[in-house]
Amino acid sequence: MDTLDEDQVQALQKAFNSFDTDDKGFITPDTVGVILRMMGVKISDRHLQEVISETDEDGSGEIEFEEFAALAAKFLSEEDEEALKKELKEAFRIYDRGGNGYITVHTLKEILRELDNKLTEDNLDSIIEEVDEDGSGTIDFNEFMKMMNG
C-alpha cells in the first residue's frame, strides 16, 4: 500500500466496506472486479483472475482489505484521479436517463446487480442505505461520487 495516498486508502476502505455488508473482513474475487470497474478500471476477467491469484496470498479465495488495497494500488495512481472523476461523471450521466441530476435507488440496484449478480437483496439494501444519505430514494452525483471515492 506504499503507493497509495491516505485519500486513496480511505476511498478503497469505504468501497471495500460497502461491499463487505456482513462485516466479515473480506470480499469475494468477483466483488473486487465490481469495485475496480466501478472505479473506472478497465480490466478483462482473465487479467483480473491472474491479478487476484497473485494477490490472494493466503489462497483463501477471500480478499481481505490489505490484499484488496495492494491489488488496487496496481491500478490507481494520482494522475488517474481526474480521469476517474470524468469517467464516473460520464457513467452517472448515462444512467441519469432523465437528465435531472440523479438516479433512482432502483437504477443503482440495477447497476450493482449488473456488475455483480451474486449481490443479495440484503446486500443491495445495505449499500443503498449507506449511499442514499438523505433517504430521498434518489442518488445525486455527490452521493454517487462519495460511494465511489469515499
From Swiss-Prot:
InterPro entries named among the record's database cross-references: CALM/Myosin/TropC-like (IPR050230), EF-hand-dom_pair (IPR011992), EF_Hand_1_Ca_BS (IPR018247), EF_hand_dom (IPR002048)
One GO cellular component term noted in the UniProt record for this chain: myosin II complex
Residues annotated to bind Ca(2+) 2: 132, 134, 136, 138, 143
Domain EF-hand: 7-42, 43-78, 83-118, 119-150
Binding residues annotated for Ca(2+) 1, in chain numbering: 56, 58, 60, 62, 67
Coiled coil: none
Assigned protein family: Belongs to the troponin C family.
Function of the protein: Troponin is the central regulatory protein of striated muscle contraction. Tn consists of three components: Tn-I which is the inhibitor of actomyosin ATPase, Tn-T which contains the binding site for tropomyosin and Tn-C. The binding of calcium to Tn-C abolishes the inhibitory action of Tn on actin filaments.
Note: This protein binds two calcium ions.
Protein name: Troponin C, isoform 1
